[in-house]
Amino acid sequence: MAAAHNPDFVVITGGEPTVHDLNELTDELHKKGLKIHLETSGAFVIKGQFDWVTLSPKKWKMPLNENLESAEEIKIIVDSEDAIQRWADKIGSIVKAEHIWLHPEWSQRADPGIINSITEWVKAHGAPYRAGYQLHKMYQADSMDKRARPTVPLGGDEKLGY
Protein backbone atom coordinates (compact mmCIF):
# COMPACT_ATOMS: atom_id res chain seq x y z
CA MET A 1 0.00 0.00 0.00
CA ALA A 2 2.74 2.51 0.95
CA ALA A 3 4.72 1.84 -2.24
CA ALA A 4 1.67 2.67 -4.39
CA HIS A 5 1.96 6.31 -3.32
CA ASN A 6 5.70 6.55 -4.14
CA PRO A 7 6.73 8.13 -0.81
CA ASP A 8 10.27 9.30 -0.05
CA PHE A 9 10.14 7.20 3.13
CA VAL A 10 7.77 5.39 5.50
CA VAL A 11 7.52 6.28 9.20
CA ILE A 12 6.72 3.58 11.74
CA THR A 13 5.43 5.25 14.90
CA GLY A 14 2.44 5.42 17.20
CA GLY A 15 2.18 3.99 20.65
CA GLU A 16 5.48 2.15 21.03
CA PRO A 17 6.25 0.26 17.82
CA THR A 18 9.26 -1.60 19.23
CA VAL A 19 7.12 -3.78 21.48
CA HIS A 20 6.65 -5.71 18.21
CA ASP A 21 9.12 -7.63 16.08
CA LEU A 22 9.29 -5.41 13.01
CA ASN A 23 11.73 -7.55 10.98
CA GLU A 24 9.14 -8.93 8.57
CA LEU A 25 7.57 -5.52 7.98
CA THR A 26 10.90 -3.76 7.41
CA ASP A 27 12.12 -6.56 5.12
CA GLU A 28 9.01 -6.21 2.94
CA LEU A 29 9.22 -2.42 2.82
CA HIS A 30 12.91 -2.54 1.89
CA LYS A 31 12.14 -5.10 -0.86
CA LYS A 32 9.82 -2.46 -2.33
CA GLY A 33 12.67 0.05 -2.28
CA LEU A 34 11.27 2.14 0.54
CA LYS A 35 13.36 3.88 3.18
CA ILE A 36 12.09 3.34 6.72
CA HIS A 37 12.11 5.80 9.61
CA LEU A 38 11.33 4.64 13.17
CA GLU A 39 10.05 6.86 15.99
CA THR A 40 10.44 5.19 19.38
CA SER A 41 11.04 5.83 23.07
CA GLY A 42 14.05 3.53 22.77
CA ALA A 43 13.00 1.55 25.85
CA PHE A 44 12.82 -1.79 24.03
CA VAL A 45 15.13 -3.72 21.71
CA ILE A 46 14.65 -2.56 18.12
CA LYS A 47 13.80 -5.55 15.92
CA GLY A 48 13.98 -4.58 12.26
CA GLN A 49 16.25 -2.71 9.85
CA PHE A 50 15.73 1.05 9.76
CA ASP A 51 17.31 3.80 7.68
CA TRP A 52 16.72 6.45 10.35
CA VAL A 53 15.82 6.19 14.03
CA THR A 54 14.37 9.03 16.09
CA LEU A 55 14.37 8.39 19.81
CA SER A 56 12.15 10.35 22.22
CA PRO A 57 12.93 9.10 25.74
CA LYS A 58 10.33 8.84 28.51
CA LYS A 59 11.08 9.46 32.19
CA TRP A 60 9.82 6.21 33.64
CA LYS A 61 11.06 3.81 30.96
CA MET A 62 14.61 4.83 30.16
CA PRO A 63 15.97 4.08 26.69
CA LEU A 64 18.41 1.23 26.22
CA ASN A 65 22.02 2.35 25.80
CA GLU A 66 22.29 0.52 22.47
CA ASN A 67 19.36 2.57 21.14
CA LEU A 68 20.81 5.85 22.44
CA GLU A 69 24.12 5.05 20.74
CA SER A 70 22.59 4.18 17.37
CA ALA A 71 19.79 6.78 17.02
CA GLU A 72 20.31 9.38 14.32
CA GLU A 73 18.08 11.86 16.11
CA ILE A 74 16.87 12.50 19.67
CA LYS A 75 13.74 14.46 20.62
CA ILE A 76 13.56 15.73 24.18
CA ILE A 77 10.21 17.00 25.42
CA VAL A 78 11.00 19.91 27.74
CA ASP A 79 8.41 19.96 30.53
CA SER A 80 10.35 22.00 33.11
CA GLU A 81 13.12 24.57 33.12
CA ASP A 82 15.64 22.00 34.34
CA ALA A 83 14.51 19.16 32.03
CA ILE A 84 17.27 19.64 29.46
CA GLN A 85 20.00 19.47 32.08
CA ARG A 86 18.39 16.39 33.68
CA TRP A 87 18.28 14.58 30.32
CA ALA A 88 21.83 15.68 29.47
CA ASP A 89 23.01 14.26 32.80
CA LYS A 90 21.18 10.95 32.21
CA ILE A 91 21.94 10.28 28.56
CA GLY A 92 24.34 12.94 27.29
CA SER A 93 27.48 10.83 27.51
CA ILE A 94 25.87 7.96 25.57
CA VAL A 95 24.11 9.81 22.74
CA LYS A 96 25.93 10.05 19.42
CA ALA A 97 23.05 11.55 17.41
CA GLU A 98 23.73 14.38 14.99
CA HIS A 99 20.53 16.16 16.03
CA ILE A 100 19.03 16.61 19.49
CA TRP A 101 15.72 18.44 19.23
CA LEU A 102 14.36 20.30 22.25
CA HIS A 103 10.56 20.63 22.06
CA PRO A 104 8.43 22.43 24.64
CA GLU A 105 5.82 20.08 26.13
CA TRP A 106 2.59 21.03 24.39
CA SER A 107 0.62 22.20 27.44
CA GLN A 108 3.57 24.44 28.36
CA ARG A 109 4.41 25.71 24.89
CA ALA A 110 3.77 29.35 25.86
CA ASP A 111 5.60 29.19 29.20
CA PRO A 112 8.39 31.80 28.99
CA GLY A 113 10.61 29.81 31.37
CA ILE A 114 10.39 26.68 29.20
CA ILE A 115 10.95 28.58 25.96
CA ASN A 116 13.85 30.53 27.48
CA SER A 117 15.49 27.36 28.80
CA ILE A 118 15.45 25.88 25.29
CA THR A 119 16.73 29.10 23.72
CA GLU A 120 19.55 29.53 26.23
CA TRP A 121 20.60 25.87 26.00
CA VAL A 122 20.84 26.01 22.21
CA LYS A 123 22.76 29.30 22.36
CA ALA A 124 25.17 27.95 24.99
CA HIS A 125 25.75 24.48 23.52
CA GLY A 126 25.06 24.77 19.79
CA ALA A 127 25.09 21.62 17.68
CA PRO A 128 23.82 18.97 18.05
CA TYR A 129 21.09 20.83 20.00
CA ARG A 130 18.26 22.48 18.08
CA ALA A 131 15.03 24.17 19.10
CA GLY A 132 11.92 22.40 17.84
CA TYR A 133 8.14 22.51 18.11
CA GLN A 134 5.43 19.85 17.98
CA LEU A 135 3.66 21.22 14.91
CA HIS A 136 1.45 18.15 14.49
CA LYS A 137 -0.29 19.14 17.72
CA MET A 138 -0.87 22.70 16.53
CA TYR A 139 -2.75 21.36 13.50
CA GLN A 140 -4.89 19.12 15.78
CA ALA A 141 -5.04 16.42 13.12
CA ASP A 142 -5.28 13.64 15.71
CA SER A 143 -7.97 15.25 17.84
CA MET A 144 -10.09 16.12 14.79
CA ASP A 145 -9.90 12.63 13.26
CA LYS A 146 -12.68 10.35 14.54
CA ARG A 147 -10.49 7.34 13.75
CA ALA A 148 -7.68 8.52 16.05
CA ARG A 149 -7.16 7.03 19.47
CA PRO A 150 -7.25 9.24 22.56
CA THR A 151 -3.99 11.00 23.31
CA VAL A 152 -1.59 9.55 25.86
CA PRO A 153 -1.13 11.59 29.05
CA LEU A 154 1.94 13.83 29.39
CA GLY A 155 5.05 11.68 29.17
CA GLY A 156 3.19 8.44 28.49
CA ASP A 157 1.34 5.96 30.66
CA GLU A 158 3.44 4.31 33.34
CA LYS A 159 0.93 1.46 33.75
CA LEU A 160 1.27 0.57 30.07
CA GLY A 161 5.06 0.90 30.07
CA TYR A 162 5.44 3.87 27.71
Enumerate the predicted regions with their spans.
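Short, glycine/charge-rich beta-strand/loop segments that flank catalytic centers
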Residues: G14-E16
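Glycine/small-residue-rich loop that forms an oxyanion/phosphate-binding "nest" at active or ligand-binding sites
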Residues: M1-I12
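Conserved AdoMet/S-adenosylmethionine-binding subsite of the radical SAM
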Residues: P7-F9, T18-G161
